[in-house]
Amino acid sequence: MKDLLKFLKAQTKTEEFDAIKIALASPDMIRSWSFGEVKKPETINYRTFKPERDGLFCARIFGPVKDYECLCGKYKRLKHRGVICEKCGVEVTQTKVRRERMGHIELASPTAHIWFLKSLPSRIGLLLDMPLRDIERVLYFESYVVIEGGMTNLERQQILTEEQYLDALEEFGDEFDAKMGAEAIQALLKSMDLEQECETLREELNETNSETKRKKLTKRIKLLEAFVQSGNKPEWMILTVLPVLPPDLRPLVPLDGGRFATSDLNDLYRRVINRNNRLKRLLDLAAPDIIVRNEKRMLQEAVDALLDNGRRGRAITGSNKRPLKSLADMIKGKQGRFRQNLLGKRVDYSGRSVITVGPYLRLHQCGLPKKMALELFKPFIYGKLELRGLATTIKAAKKMVEREEAVVWDILDEVIREHPVLLNRAPTLHRLGIQAFEPVLIEGKAIQLHPLVCAAYNADFDGDQMAVHVPLTLEAQLEARALMMSTNNILSPANGEPIIVPSQDVVLGLYYMTRDCVNAKGEGMVLTGPKEAERIYRAGLASLHARVKVRITEYEKDENGEFVATTSLKDTTVGRAILWMIVPKGLPFSIVNQALGKKAISKMLNTCYRILGLKPTVIFADQTMYTGFAYAARSGASVGIDDMVIPEKKHEIISEAEAEVAEIQEQFQSGLVTAGERYNKVIDIWAAANDRVSKAMMDNLQTETVINRDGQEEQQVSFNSIYMMADSGARGSAAQIRQLAGMRGLMAKPDGSIIETPITANFREGLNVLQYFISTHGARKGLADTALKTANSGYLTRRLVDVAQDLVVTEDDCGTHEGILMTPVIEGGDVKEPLRDRVLGRVTAEDVLKPGTADILVPRNTLLHEQWCDLLEANSVDAVKVRSVVSCDTDFGVCAHCYGRDLARGHIINKGEAIGVIAAQSIGEPGTQLTMRTFHIGGAASRAAAESSIQVKNKGSIKLSNVKSVVNSSGKLVITSRNTELKLLDEFGRTKESYKVPYGAVMAKGDGEQVAGGETVANWDPHTMPVITEVSGFIRFTDMIDGQTITRQTDELTGLSSLVVLDSAERTTGGKDLRPALKIVDAQGNDVLIPGTDMPAQYFLPGKAIVQLEDGVQISSGDTLARIPQESGGTKDITGGLPRVADLFEARRPKEPAILAEIAGIVSFGKETKGKRRLVITPVDGSDPYEEMIPKWRQLNVFEGERVERGDVISDGPEAPHDILRLRGVHAVTRYIVNEVQDVYRLQGVKINDKHIEVIVRQMLRKATIESAGSSDFLEGEQVEYSRVKIANRELEANGKVGATFSRDLLGITKASLATESFISAASFQETTRVLTEAAVAGKRDELRGLKENVIVGRLIPAGTGYAYHQDRMRRRAAGEQPATPQVTAEDASASLAELLNAGLGGSDNE
């Protein structure tokens, strides 16, 4: 027995390893793996089905076909194990060695490995510095290459055609050496001196200045250094020995009917062996050169096809015309080894079935069909039966279970008790897609699911299926119970709000229950408490909605957490009093004393969780559900056609609109409006009519008139079923009711343009044929969109997970003082997101001071929970600097303080939490709710876009920031700065509204002045951009020559004449170099200086500028000198929805990005070229000016002589994130991406915490480009991991050396995933071949830091519960311990096993 145990131990030995290295295999290494050479292309004997000797399935090389039995049958049984049969040469051992023993083929001529040849950039080409084309010509025997020039004038690596070679032979004889084929390339690679080459290249690099040459040299140096450091030899890229895959990994399976199913690899290997053997024979026979060459080329092609079929030339096809699957195809793509078998496996002990509702379940339960449970828990049942002595052997137990004896069911009940199972619904978009429940045995065949978890699973009961999995080991059960139980996942990880919220029927029931009604039965009663309320309701003495007075006892927590009771008489309704009975102690009565809609219920559960914690919340959620279902049933709310009340006014509204449309049509026919204007106006009219109809309809539905107790009429909220459903948030929306009872309105064509005749009918009246046909467009587009959206959203999630998968919380506090400044999100007059929502659950980076004092309100490193946020609001703080993952200083991973609160648990995040994956899921999961389309702006929208004034909504004081201004002659402020912001502050100094003020706006109120609500504070002309003078004096024209640089135009209506500056294209040759400008001089004719500088005030005028002043006129500061007409931007498409999110995360450059100033200084314009202007910025400190060419058609925001700061906008447009990072830094680009992504999600009403987007941004900023190397080993211009530069610089500074300087890079998520340090993770994501080729050449080590790599090598992941295991391993490693393997005797083992089973299965009564 002992031997057997030892033997079993030996069979399952595990290797402890810390990293995986990939490198080129040398021929000797391949031979050392091999168990013998495969010499023949035969596979198995078709009569005996035995493998042929020396063939591809040879038993002597690869091992026996049957366990412990040699091929000829001389040795059978375990006792002969390890014997090698002298007759057939097969070792007697397990057959599974056929999965691990490799063979090899000795190639008669070397062949190039296609990956290193054709995977761009070609490694062989880069190493030899030869073009790929030339190398291929040599390899495929079209030309010669010179290997050794000798004393001749031939250069090494020179390519010779057949003729040139023969000429050279005649001329030089055997002075030189030239060959063709892979031998030639092998000789070239072999004779390279890598270190020497490196030296020469580095010297060359220091001498050259041309950018392209430097790039090329750095590439070669990197490759050469990689070879030197990894110990790879260049000639190993040419194969002389080919490894053969173990036969069980490329099986040959006999089908019935004498046919065989085989892996494509066998075909590919057979071709290689056939050609190789033929080549050997030809060489032995000393065949003519041309025949041998042809055979060598064929061998090269066969090896290429085996390694990567189809990479070069046409793919080799099998008998059925489909390309054969080569070794490379085995590992790449969705069906490849990585994604199919290593990252996703099928698991045992699982089942799936349809789901139905389980409204009587508790939150932690699910209904499991008996049939399924019996099958899933079989091993446990067998064990239990044997333990009880009811079955003597496992076989007997099996029989009992198959007969389904009565005792089996009792045992099943025992086994299932307290044994959680996991339920999963595909697609699993976030971690709440798999949760644990305690099974309850039920009859029937469908799984019952608790209704409240449907939101998390996104499940409904229209035929959805779910899978059940059984956690087998004790640890797995523990994790399922502690971490995955549905009761532990009440809050959504995406936004920290409850995800266990009632919906649909439950909401309707609670809403119906808490509504009040005028003059209902029993109004005015005074009741002793909720119990009496329920009694009189059940007795039929009072209606649920009756307004009554009830004595209510509320409990409140004091400082010590004790409950203090207060009792009072409350005005409420019978229904609310009944509902109060299930509300847990500690919540105020006001929480139910209102008509409860979906939002209110969600808020109620949230409050409960924050005040009372997990357990009461779970019980409360369950109770609300039961109550909701019960009262929804009692309400009898139903929908009939009469509930859809059509407003009387509808008819007249539509006829008015029709009249207006007819009028517009007349104007169009008489030529007063253009076709475009007519179309836009018609659409506006119908849109307005539709709104009026729907408003009339909603007003009609919303209220009803009833007689109250005093006999008077009174308005009350309607009890119309449809309205109640929409109002409570149970189902439907105002827009849907509008289609039922209002009018359907305008429809779009398939291309997105709006059809100008609306559908005036609604669904109650019914549509006619034309209307129905028009409707079909939209309906079909909706379906097509949904299908596309799902795929796109899934792909976005996959890329996000891949880029963030290795980000884990690794330490408690990194100690940084960096952070990002959080302010409320304000757009125009609305606060889109208040400050408390943005800072809740974050850690302060600096002390927060009480506004206007030096008192510390919140100390540094405080986790801001709800109470702190209340304090901030009470003290009207409107900006808080909080820690952020983007600025976290941890080298690998992030620290808990920079992340803040774990949103799903409500406390600070634990170490080992996989925040990267959580972030990716939180952003990706709502992806399917985003729209797919780009929005076209036309009609009403585009006209409203040209604003010309700012009107504030609230009263308060004005605060201007980034402002330069002058006072004009009438005493008003005129803005002369570009990016001025106007904020409206309330009396506490909180920002209520925020607006952008353009250049040239005239302010009605100045900085710090008080305004009333509704007041207009700024005006400007939206169609022209003014040129405003900052000084007073007299105008002097310079270079303004009529006919050359300017032309006079007279307005026909007013008779005023104005000067228009000609565009440089329209000028005569004499006027090309003139620079028209307006100079301001004083009465003596001297230049006036711009205040604060020593520059004369002169304003250069761009083309098309209009001047309405004459030479020599007196002007005062703040006056408009000239106007530049702005072309109104045509209808620009706004990319919205999913494509916009993808663009942001992929960091794509917009089509026409904004042009930003690269340095601070004074703007001037240099010499123009065709179609472009030269913009020159000269720094004030006199360093080198910066030049940029800008296309003429771009509208510029700056004038000559203006001062700009680095990062200022020179020409408007969407900003490119790379520019923001380069010019304004990491925080600015974070703020930009976070805000832009949030805008898209906010439009759809999806809440995601900023943290998640910041996590992804941190991963996008993973790389840095070295600017100067200092004393480090980096090359300049090299892109390296930011953490590596940080660590290297820290070490260098500690030794007093100079560190490297670098700039951060922003990579898109796909690029960032492929650029990770881990080649395993990158290879399993995309472009497998390229990643593996690169890694092999560089001899990369994968440190297995991320989650993906560890899943692939089959270990616990270094996150969650696996985090401790990895920490422990590292500690043991550091201490140099060996993991102890205890010496166990068989008796001990079996005893402890029995003990464990008893303890684990609750049967320790020793029967």
Swiss-Prot record:
Keywords: DNA-directed RNA polymerase, Magnesium, Metal-binding, Nucleotidyltransferase, Transcription, Transferase, Zinc. Mg(2+) binds at residues 460, 462, 464. One of its GO terms (cellular component) is DNA-directed RNA polymerase complex. Zn(2+) 2 binds at residues 814, 888, 895, 898. It comes from the Bacteria. GO terms for molecular function: DNA binding; DNA-directed RNA polymerase activity; magnesium ion binding; zinc ion binding. Its cofactor is Mg(2+); Zn(2+). Zn(2+) 1 binds at residues 70, 72, 85, 88. GO terms for biological process: DNA-templated transcription. SMART domains: RPOLA_N. Pfam families: RNA_pol_Rpb1_1, RNA_pol_Rpb1_2, RNA_pol_Rpb1_3, RNA_pol_Rpb1_4, RNA_pol_Rpb1_5. Binds 1 Mg(2+) ion per subunit. Binds 2 Zn(2+) ions per subunit. The keyword Cell inner membrane does not apply. DNA-dependent RNA polymerase catalyzes the transcription of DNA into RNA using the four ribonucleoside triphosphates as substrates. The RNAP catalytic core consists of 2 alpha, 1 beta, 1 beta' and 1 omega subunit. When a sigma factor is associated with the core the holoenzyme is formed, which can initiate transcription. This is DNA-directed RNA polymerase subunit beta'. It comes from Salmonella arizonae (strain ATCC BAA-731 / CDC346-86 / RSK2980). The gene is rpoC.
